[in-house]
Design a protein with these regions (language model features):
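Conserved beta-strand signature within the Rossmann-like core of class I S-adenosyl-L-methionine
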Residues: 261-270
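Conserved SAM-binding loop of SAM-dependent methyltransferases across substrates and taxa
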Residues: 49-59
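Class I S-adenosyl-L-methionine-dependent methyltransferase module
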Residues: 71-206
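S-adenosyl-L-methionine
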Residues: 1-39
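Conserved SAM-binding motif I beta-strand of class I
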Residues: 63-67
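Core SAM-dependent methyltransferase catalytic element
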Residues: 280-310
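A short acidic, Gly/Pro-enriched loop at the edge of an enzyme's catalytic core
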Residues: 223-234
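A short glycine-rich, Lys/Arg-flanked "PGG" loop and its adjoining helix->strand segment in the class I
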Residues: 248-260
Length: 310
C-alpha cells in the first residue's frame, strides 16, 4: 500500500478509526461529462459520497468507484442504492461556519441566502455578492477562521492543513465571486450545498446501484488493473495531503491502467502554480484552485501527454 494520509479515514484531529468524511460531493461532474470519451467508456473514479460515480453511470459509462476509507465506501454504497444523505466531517465544518455567519451577518441568514440562490443572472449575482454578502463582517469572520493558525487549520490534520492556501480567507472569497460571476445560481447545486447545506429544490436523488465499488488504495487498484484497462480516471483531490512519493506512485499506476489517449482529471485545493488553474473556473462547486485535465500520450515518460484546456 502506498503512503497517504487518506488511509486514516479522517480529516480532522482526534482519536479513533475512520469516519464518514463527505456526506455529499463538492465536485462539478459536468467537467468529467464534458471531457471523457464517449460512453460507454471504462472509468475509474474516487467513490467519496457517490455523486460523480452516479452521474457517470447515468451517462452510460462503465464505472468503478474506489475509496480507501471503509466507512466512506459503505456510505457510498448505501447512498447509490437510494439511501439518504447524512452529515460527514466536511459538512460539520461547513455547518459551523454557516451558523457563525448566519448569527452575526443578516445577509447570511438562510432566508436571505435562499433568495440569492434563486438568481439566474451572473451580473446581478455579482452585485448582490459584493453589496449584500462580501462585506466587512464576512471578511473579519473568514480572517479569524480560515487564515493560518485559524479555526480551520487547528481542526484539520496537519497533512491536510498544509494544502490550504496561506491567505485562504481572501482566496475563498475570490473563488466564490468567480463562481457567481460565471454560473447562474439557480442551476448550481454545489452552491446550494455550500451556502445552505441542502440540495436545491427539485434535485434528482443519487441512484446508481450498479456502480462497481472497490475498497482500497487507488494506487493499488490501478496497479492491479489490466494494462490500458481504463479509458479515463477522475481522481478527485487524492494528491492533497500526500507527499511526492505518493504522487510518483500514482503517476506510474495511472500510466499502467489508462490506455494511451485516455483522460485523467485531478483537482486540488491549492492555489495554482505556473501551469494555471485549468478548469477550476468551470467547476461550479467554487472550492477548487486547480482542476487539471490531461490526455495521456503513448510515451511512458509523459513527453507527449497533452493538457486539455477549457
Amino acid at each position: 500500500m502506498s503512503i497517504t494520509p487518506w488511509t486514516r479515514g479522517r480529516i480532522l484531529g482526534g482519536f479513533g478509526g475512520p469516519r464518514l468524511l463527505f456526506g455529499r460531493m463538492y465536485e462539478d461532474h459536468g467537467i468529467e461529462l464534458g471531457v471523457l470519451p464517449a460512453s460507454p467508456s471504462r472509468v475509474l473514479c474516487i467513490a467519496s459520497a457517490g455523486d460523480t460515480a452516479a452521474a457517470l453511470h447515468q451517462a452510460g459509462h462503465d464505472v468503478t468507484a474506489v475509496d480507501i476509507n471503509p466507512v466512506q465506501l459503505a456510505y457510498a454504497r448505501t447512498r447509490l442504492s437510494g439511501g439518504a444523505s447524512v452529515e460527514g466531517a466536511a459538512e460539520t465544518l461547513m455547518r459551523l461556519g454557516r451558523g457563525a455567519a448566519g448569527t452575526l451577518l443578516p445577509g447570511w441568514r438562510e432566508d436571505a441566502l435562499g433568495a440569492f440562490l434563486t438568481l439566474d443572472d451572473p451580473a446581478r449575482q455579482v452585485r448582490c455578492w459584493r453589496g449584500d454578502l462580501d462585506g466587512p463582517g464576512l471578511r473579519r469572520l473568514m480572517r479569524w477562521s480560515l487564515r493560518p493558525g485559524g479555526a480551520l487549520a487547528m481542526a484539520l490534520l496537519p497533512s491536510f492543513a498544509s494544502v490550504v492556501p496561506a491567505r485562504f480567507d481572501e482566496v475563498f472569497r475570490q473563488r466564490l465571486e468567480r463562481t457567481v460571476a460565471r454560473h447562474p445560481n439557480v442551476r448550481n447545486p454545489w452552491l446550494w450545498r455550500l451556502f445552505v447545506g441542502a440540495e436545491q429544490p427539485g434535485a434528482v436523488p443519487v441512484h446508481a446501484p450498479d456502480v462497481r465499488l472497490v475498497q482500497g488504495d487507488v494506487v493499488d487498484v490501478l496497479e492491479r488493473a489490466p494494462r490500458g484497462g481504463y479509458d479515463a480516471v477522475t481522481l478527485s483531490n487524492v494528491l492533497d495531503g500526500p507527499g511526492p512519493a505518493f504522487a510518483g506512485q500514482l503517476r506510474a499506476a495511472v500510466r499502467h491502467a489508462v490506455r494511451p489517449g485516455g483522460i485523467v482529471v485531478l483537482r486540488s485545493f491549492r492555489e495554482p502554480g505556473p501551469a494555471g488553474a485549468g478548469w477550476a473556473a468551470q467547476d461550479r462547486s467554487a472550492l477548487w484552485g486547480v482542476v487539471r485535465v490531461v490526455r495521456l500520450g503513448a510515451n511512458p515518460d509523459g513527453t507527449n501527454d497533452r493538457r486539455i484546456d477549457p
